[in-house]
Amino acid sequence: MSEEAYFYGLRNFAHFHGPRHIDIRLSKPQQEEALKTHIALHHQYAPQAGWVSCVIETVEQAENTKLLIKQAYDTCVSLKTRFKSAK
């Protein structure tokens, strides 16, 4: 993982590998949709945890990646909110 990593609390939801490659942690349904629509690639090491990979070389890829990062962040917020209300 690079120093360009994004967290919500202690949960890492995205991190870069170089200037154009990013891994993003999605919910399982989000992961399935991103893979089915070909806006993300299978993560090499941790697909079972919801991770996908994106390569950013075009404006369209950048826009799709931004949407996935937003989904990942929103999932983190939702998980934290659910965890707090369960206490």
Describe each model-derived feature in a short phrase:
Residues P47-K87:
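Well-ordered alpha/beta subsegment
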